[in-house]
Amino acid sequence: LGNAHKIMGRVLYALAKDYDFNIVSINGGNAANVIAQYNTTEIIADPAQAQAIADAVTGLEQTISSEFAGQEPTLSLNAVSEGETALKAFDADTTAHVIGFLYGAIDGVQCYDRAFPTAVESSLNTGIVETTEDTVKIKFQVRSSVATKLDDMRNKLDLATDLAGASREISGEYPAWSYNADSVIRPKAIELYKEMFGKEPTVETTHGGLECGILFGKKNDLDIISFGPDLTG
């Protein structure tokens, strides 16, 4: 699915190649762990270029929509001119750094689980972009069942942060808990489930934070399984 922040980063990067503008504000997203559905960016540019910028955005909308091949039927890019006005905007360097970071930072699924090829192993999401009085905050959700892969994604974000002359802060963490192909307790639990309920259980991995990861981090020789409820609706 298309992340609105990443799409906006691409649009701004493309526009910056042909037009001079400064960002006034950039905002969007509701939660760090939810793929952003919208991004609203306000820029200030030469009024004489307003129509050309709007036309360029229309062209980018057509290009990006065709790339999704119908998977994002409601994707829409709109450029609205507010006329001549005086606004406080980012300087040229900050504008370039925000665009470069938003467009260049890694996002989405990074790799799948080798034991379960259809299950995501490592991913991250550009969830919230927020402009305050003198700061742009970009919030990510970073997840992996492999601790070293988690570190690798964070290192890449750190690099992008350094290149943008920005700072970063980690708040909250989901310890990794990898699939154990040699688990002793799992086959026993499967057999017990069949005895109790007369059917095969569904055995799968989940791409999310579980308390098991915290326990495993404290004692990594544990053999752990987790049970989840049946969810409907």
Task: List the predicted regions and their residue ranges.
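Midchain, well-structured core segments that form catalytic/ion-binding scaffolds
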Residues: 1-142
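Generic, well-ordered alpha-helical scaffold segments in large soluble proteins
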Residues: 11-14, 56, 60, 156-160, ...
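A structural preference for short, hydrophobic beta-strand core positions in alpha/beta folds
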Residues: 25, 77-81, 168-172, 203-205
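Short glycine/threonine-rich loop-to-helix capping motif typified by GTGT followed
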Residues: 32-40, 93, 178-191, 214-218
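Zn-dependent metallopeptidase/amidohydrolase metal-coordination segment
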Residues: 114, 121-123, 127-134, 141, ...
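C-terminal catalytic subdomain
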Residues: 136-154
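Redox- and metal-dependent alpha/beta enzyme cores, enriched for Fe-S-associated oxidoreductases
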Residues: 148-167, 176
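Generic long, charged, amphipathic alpha-helical segments
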Residues: 164-196
